[in-house]
From Swiss-Prot:
Binds 1 Mg(2+) ion per subunit. It comes from the Bacteria. Coiled coil: none annotated. It catalyses: alpha-D-glucosamine 1-phosphate + acetyl-CoA = N-acetyl-alpha-D-glucosamine 1-phosphate + CoA + H(+); N-acetyl-alpha-D-glucosamine 1-phosphate + UTP + H(+) = UDP-N-acetyl-alpha-D-glucosamine + diphosphate. Residues 254-455 are annotated as: N-acetyltransferase. Its EC number is 2.7.7.23, 2.3.1.157. Keywords: Acyltransferase, Cell shape, Cell wall biogenesis/degradation, Cytoplasm, Magnesium, Metal-binding, Multifunctional enzyme, Nucleotidyltransferase, Peptidoglycan synthesis, Repeat, Transferase. The active site is at 366 (proton acceptor). In the N-terminal section; belongs to the N-acetylglucosamine-1-phosphate uridyltransferase family. This is Bifunctional protein GlmU. The keyword Metal-binding applies.
Amino acid sequence: MASTTGALILAAGKGTRMHSDKPKVLQTILGEPMLRFVMDALAPVFGDRVWTVVGHRADMIYAAFAGEDARFVVQEQQLGTGHALQMAWESLRAAGLDRVVVVNGDTPLLATETIDFFLKESAEADIAFMTLTLPDPGAYGRVVRHNGHVAAIVEAKDYDEALYGPEPSEINTGIYALRLDAVESLLPRLTNANRSGEYYITDLVGLAVAERMNVLGIQCGEDPNLLGVNNPAELIRSEALLRTRLVIGHIEGGVLIHAPETVRISPRATIEPGAEIYGPCEIYGTSRIARGAVVHSHCWLRNAEVESGSEVKSFSHLEGATVGKGCSVGPFARLRPGAVLDEEARVGNFVEMKKARLHKGAKAGHLTYLGDADVGAGANIGAGTITCNYDGKNKHRTVIGAGAFIGSNTALVAPVTVGDGSLVGAGSVITKDVPEASLAIARGRQTNLPRKPKA
């Protein structure tokens, strides 16, 4: 695609029918903002030549895409789609574009192949738009044709049969291709003389026809995937379709997915051929599951990495965690951001880790909290052990040396270090460093007293 063609996403609206405080384009599908699916569909065609018009709660959209190479244009007042184009015009011109494809930010089912097709079909047009024929056109803008040629697009609420004739079933999808040189003279002529009091991008069509420009309405059959998401029911429908599309893609790519109808996978997740997933299971964000890894049912992963030969057992929760090769996690384990398991490390049931590392072969079998900790190779953490890392104001680190053995029900009060090969007796409260190859016991002495006879 030539570098003079770009894309504009309209994402400034409130989406009141979603009954939510956040912008409609931030409603989540498979753990991702709806807007991301639109951006992902456009990126292979336009690269970084994609702008997004934001308005309502723009701050939330900025935060959702912080750190990413996204370009935004602000529409302070939401005065319609035509006004949104006017707000973006200077940016589009400054980028040296000849053509721009305009899409709505609430079309998560939009496919890259559809955009490719549309660009080829509209190559010679001054203005082109995609249309569908629906048995029930609903609230979508109607396409008016005279002798097969496009005459205008009329919003449903403004349609008057006395002016335009019998109401057609062909509707506008809201996807446009505009030649900037042709449209530039038309933009200032948009008015808000309609029932909504808004400036419609659709009015450019009628203006262009009046100027005898080349206007095309490109028909795409009855594909509902081109339509926007306007309410919770449509959001759930779109999510179901995308979930199926993504899961089938992974299966066809060589991933073994059991009960695939119960598995949810983010479009940003990477699952290598030869990995095995048991449903129900949820894999979100930039998670990566390597070849030969197994994730069992009822697990939840976000931005987690699981290397080959590792097994994540049922009911485990991993977020921002890294699981090395040949590891075992769970069942019922929780690995929070910054948790790292090196090769052949093991974490059992009801173990929680946060900003903690288990080096090669280290084990924490059950009922343990490891926070802000470094556990050396081959060390063993007994049941009920906790690192007391927070003093009410600051966090402190615990270091456990290679080959150390921490007895059950031990409290390690950070900052503290247990040296290599040391043994900590069960039930100890360790407040001072333990030298290498030492035995540390810090608990009250047991006293046995005879019971008094019952009266």
